[in-house]
């Protein structure tokens, strides 16, 4: 009984003491985080980044758990100026995060260390995932108009962008024969 009273008295002190150490990366103490990245693209989002994550630097940094650096920017989309974040891993862009209505709406993953939960990652060949583009793929738009975007099988939120060599007319999709040698260059999650 005495140890129970002591524990009840010590518990609030321990809990308040931990709250003052918010800068400590506690997830690093978990053994399953010791060996490699646990960040994956899933139906819910990318790692802890989901559709409910506010499009704010601190919220994104908290969800990334200190594993990356953030860089913010502005761009125009459909005639509006919008904010976006680039997630940096060293000197390379690992992810681009876009949003609307105050929360994350799209995450473009460019880092081969962040796979989809199905195992697909940057560099996976088209032929490993699809036998033909028809019914699965379409030309990518915007800055990526030389690429092809394909919906991930069984997914409502994930698609893969493939790129490779092709010298055909602009605006047309490459043939299935050409696409079989293309590789995933971007994994896209949309809300």
UniProtKB/Swiss-Prot annotation:
Pfam families: DUF1131
UniProt signal peptide: 1-22
Gene3D superfamilies attached to this UniProt entry: protein yfey like domain (2.60.460.10)
Keyword Signal applies: yes
Classification via PROSITE patterns: PROKAR_LIPOPROTEIN
Top-level taxonomic group: Bacteria
Keywords: Signal
Protein known as: Uncharacterized protein YfeY
Organism: Escherichia coli (strain K12)
